[in-house]
């Protein structure tokens, strides 16, 4: 494996060359997104012989960096759910972590806006839900207060949520990966898991180098792990299925973004959201001023057939104008250019409504495996809290 294909931020000492030449490990983490890197950093503080394997050339190339980069507050999720608990805890942990480790972020707050009495009642319900989850500092503000903060936004009132912010997910992943390696963890990219074989006191993890798309023969390497942690994101259901766990299926939902042209970036100062979709599919097309002073419009939310279908049949800019016009009346098609898209790991199938909770649990039939499935938003915000939760499950296995 060429080291030129590895992330620049990975210390050379952390690179594992094929063959792996390791027979056994305490922990193998599958998936090197923000959650996988957070788990690697946390578990390697407690245990030695920790391995993180990622099939892509760099860490965080999937959903972890193809999003709005928002630090969520926890107002949307059902009280008592893992999403609510881990988001609220993760919000506090993430701000502290960013301050300590000089990770680029901004605690800017956000406005969730409304236009009529019905929407005002929905905003008040959203605030009550947030308070039940432990979110503090929220308040309802009137049109004048909205205009003072966002002069070009049309809203009769809004829920102000000061604990929301934005973060450089790339910086966060870089720091987590570096800390994991400094603590002795071994990180491997371009390593695809092709087989998981449960044994009496371990799971055998079989890897091949690369994506195998060229059809070339690849040698297999196997690590016998006392604990396997599935952090494979969009592919977590496929990893679980290798252990005979078919309980959950991931339905990919693509979210597309546009960006305001630079000349119109003055139209938005911070974060402005509509009320979330009633079906729970998304938070709606919102406006995000990034850390680089660009303004994102999106994401949309549409089910797609393939987990890597980022670009086929992209929506035209006119569709973004239609969806954003109720927030920003001045927006026109000429103000927008297509940006990137991301794919979310939804557990709710097409045609159904509701918010599915994170699945974070020991596998019911394979006692040495921990499954993390359906880790979509607020996964970035929750990542450090998720890692702490996973440590407690790993301790049950490794004690």
Give the predicted meaning of each segment:
Residues 2-27, 45-46:
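Extreme N-terminal leader/targeting segments of oxidoreductases
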Residues 25-52:
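N-terminal Rossmann-like FAD-binding beta1-loop-alpha1 element of flavoenzymes
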Residues 38, 196-298, 302-311, 322, ...:
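Flavin-dependent oxidoreductases
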Residues 44-66:
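Glycine-rich FAD pyrophosphate-binding loop
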Residues 69-145, 149, 155, 284-285:
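Dinucleotide-binding Rossmann-like beta1-alpha1 core, especially the glycine-rich loop
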Residues 78-89, 113-122, 160-179, 188, ...:
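Short beta-strand to alpha-helix junction loop
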Residues 159-226, 384, 393:
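Helical element adjacent to the flavin cofactor pocket in flavoenzyme catalytic cores
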Residues 282, 309-399:
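C-terminal catalytic lobe of FAD-dependent flavoproteins
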